[in-house]
């Protein structure tokens, strides 16, 4: 291949491929000229490699690997359901954005996988809590690895 560079397909956000196309698959890589960055298709979304995705939630939700969630339980308890079939090393981060976990808990539903080696859901009731869970395999499941 030498020392030259490879030029990926280039197009705007509006020109992203989609639908039924034999050249459009999970893992497709392109340069998006609208945002001035590389992006790849993960099977459901176009994502920029190395860029963290954030989501603000205030009601129960299904958590996705690789995302950071700003959770507001000001309106009542929120349940975050972990992925049923996580990949080894999958990571999910939660922040108590409203500082209300002490009055309205965050419940992390294990979805059949252990949390810290226990077969029980995780109840978070510490105001201002911020933590990440990383999937370590079937024995210990999801582990808290940063607080």
Each language-model region and where it sits:
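Exposed extracellular interaction/assembly regions and N-terminal maturation sites
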Residues: 1-11, 45-109, 138-147
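A broadly tuned "polar low-complexity/structure-edge" signature
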Residues: 3-18, 131-133
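Short, solvent-exposed loop/turn segments at secondary-structure junctions
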Residues: 15, 77-78, 116-117
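Short hydrophobic/aromatic-rich beta-strand motifs
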Residues: 18-41, 66-72, 87-98, 120-124, ...
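Short, solvent-exposed loop/turn motifs
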Residues: 30, 45-46, 114
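A sequence-level detector of short linear motifs
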Residues: 40, 47-48, 116
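Short edge-strand/loop segments of extracellular domains
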Residues: 109-118
